[in-house]
Amino acid sequence: MKIGILALQGAFAEHAKVLDQLGVESVELRNLDDFQQDQSDLSGLILPGGESTTMGKLLRDQNMLLPIREAILSGLPVFGTCAGLILLAKEITSQKESHLGTMDMVVERNAYGRQLGSFYTEAECKGVGKIPMTFIRGPIISSVGEGVEILATVNNQIVAAQEKNMLVSSFHPELTDDVRLHQYFINMCKEKS
């Protein structure tokens, strides 16, 4: 099994460490050639936290947006954390256009931003159990479509969800010692292969 990690910007190295800890090979995807070269070998894709506007621009500049979108729509399992969640959203409240736009949800950028600051909590995540959650100016999921399963909420806000082959979290599971959400994603990848 090999998981691709979008490595344009953001917390990609931390995800690679978690996958290594779980005995799963990972590859950093920095440009279209990397993605096309490894695409047929990939069991899944991680879109890490970072700055979503910058990542969206880099995806477009590197001509990676449409090929990644097509792969996700064709069933490639994807795990978007924080900015990665924003990249997957069909609608972003503060922007006119989405990026990949594959997951039926509306998100609000930086909802856990300046007004609330970064914070840590623990909460139940369906199919995983009670897990630590680190929020760093994270987004919230304002609403989801019928096909989206809500996996976790904090203070009545949706912070983790799944739609078919797409898993998202507002928080950064790669910044804790708890690997269960990554294991959940690996299990999704195994089911698809």
From Swiss-Prot:
Keywords assigned: Glutamine amidotransferase, Hydrolase, Lyase, Pyridoxal phosphate
Pathway(s) this gene product operates in, as recorded in its UniProt entry: Cofactor biosynthesis; pyridoxal 5'-phosphate biosynthesis
Gene Ontology cellular component terms for the protein in this record: cytosol; glutaminase complex
Keyword Magnesium: no
GO terms for biological process, alphabetical: glutamine catabolic process; pyridoxal phosphate biosynthetic process; pyridoxine metabolic process
GO molecular function: glutaminase activity; pyridoxal 5'-phosphate synthase (glutamine hydrolysing) activity
Keyword Lyase attributed: yes
PROSITE patterns: PDXT_SNO_1, PDXT_SNO_2
Top-level division of the source organism's lineage: Bacteria
Catalytic activity, EC: 4.3.3.6, 3.5.1.2
Binding-site positions, L-glutamine: 50-52, 109, 136-137
HAMAP family linked to this entry: PdxT
Primary role: Catalyzes the hydrolysis of glutamine to glutamate and ammonia as part of the biosynthesis of pyridoxal 5'-phosphate. The resulting ammonia molecule is channeled to the active site of PdxS.
Subunit comment: In the presence of PdxS, forms a dodecamer of heterodimers. Only shows activity in the heterodimer.
Full protein name: Pyridoxal 5'-phosphate synthase subunit PdxT
Species for this entry: Streptococcus pneumoniae (strain Hungary19A-6)
